[in-house]
Amino acid sequence: HSIFTIIMTESIKVYDTTLRDGTQGEGVSFTVAGKIRVAEKLDQFGVDYIEGGWPGSNPRDMAFFEEAKKLDLKHAKIAAFGSTRRASLSAKEDPQLRLLLDANTPVVTIFGKTWLLHVTEILRTTAEENLKMIEDSVRFLTNNGRDVIYDAEHFFDGFCDNPEYALQTLESAKRGGAINLTLCDTNGGKLVSEVNEIVAKVVAHFPDTPIGVHCHNDSGLGVAVSLAGIESGASLVQGTINGVGERNGNANLTTIIPNLILKMNKELKCAANLNQIRDLSLFIDEMANRSSDNSAPFVGPAAFAHKGGVHADAAAKVKNSYEHIEPELVGNRTRVLVSDMSGRSSVMMKAKEIGVDLDARSPELKDFLAELKELEFRGYGYEAADASFKLLLNRFLKGKKNDFELIDYRVMVGHQSALKRTVSEAVSYTHLTLPTILPV
């Protein structure tokens, strides 16, 4: 049996907002067709809710919701996002709430103000009117057949400022018929201890209403405070794939989900597809036209890469000595990086990885290691150069000729003043040694 046995206990719902909050991140953008493909991929993975955008905020989101009506999703529910009614209008008169209905999604998520600073200084209305705005908006959407998730914006800041009023805003949403009350750390400034304490108090205050958390990464704690919220009784977690989002990003679902399943023993609908989470991460980056994070926990190429000789040696003997989970559980793999820090174990593991079997007692291995370290000292790098490593290994241990022989090379650098640019040209001449092909 695997040493990483998973025992499920409590069910947690995953709410993905990559297509809405994620697109507010710098350099993140999806086409309408791209958003549809992302929604399908998220559904295949098994998330519970997919927040598709804000109807009326831009033509792209409007087009997405039109196209989304044609989707045949197996697991997830599409959610439209918007705000409570304006202070000067009734819910049925508010054009933004009408657009939320026109999106024709089974779920609508609306946010309202919790922090009195925002109520009086941003909305410029009264505390009492804000409570009515929340209740009226939720009830209007509920009466029109929508499941409503209420996002309590700036909840933690508002609670610290005035706990009684913060709870009153949630009570207003509950009276309106919200199926979930999600507490938002909108500024991303709260610590784990604060979120733990506040979520526990809210859960105790609303024992029969599901509580969610929506956190940001401004303090580098987006994942930690999200897990803290779940630990304190929340049953829904919001976030984005790869943590994309405004400023420093949203809580990263590609880190949260494995932790919930593998470390906290929570039951998630997507647990059966956990080994696809790295593929999902790469897919989202590709669709958003952004570079992947090499060091991302669980899903990054470096997540299970061993460079130090001691680490590689220990991992070769006992896999979990330097790996906190089996990489395959999240669709990743163990990698060995060869450098001047490498020892015999590192070289042997790397050689095996590229299809070369080595004898640990081989007298050439010691000389090869010395040569490798000398080359690294002189500035050569083999960490990301598997082909160069293999060529050196073949020459050193097997007495083979290189697969090619450098005959000559020429490098020219010049400046074309008319075009105001520097032009470089490099030409090499090689002789290839090809394997003999025998007739069948």
Give residue ranges: language-model regions.
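N-terminal capping/small domains of soluble enzymes
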Residues: M8-S90, V338
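A mid-to-C-terminal "edge-of-domain" accessory segment
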Residues: S11-I12, T18, M264-Y429
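Active-site mouth loops of central-metabolism enzymes
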Residues: T18-A33, G82-S90, E121-A127, H154-P163, ...
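Alpha/beta enzyme core
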Residues: V32-F45, K92-I110, T114-T120, E128, ...
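Glycine-rich, proline-tolerant flexible connector loops at the mouths of alpha/beta enzymes
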Residues: D48-D72, F81-R85, K113-R124, H154-G158, ...
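Alpha-helix-loop-beta-strand connector modules within alpha/beta enzyme cores
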Residues: M62-S83, K132-N143, I198-I211
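Catalytic cores of alpha/beta
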Residues: L221-S232
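Conserved small/polar residues in nucleotide/adenosyl-binding loops
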Residues: T430-T436
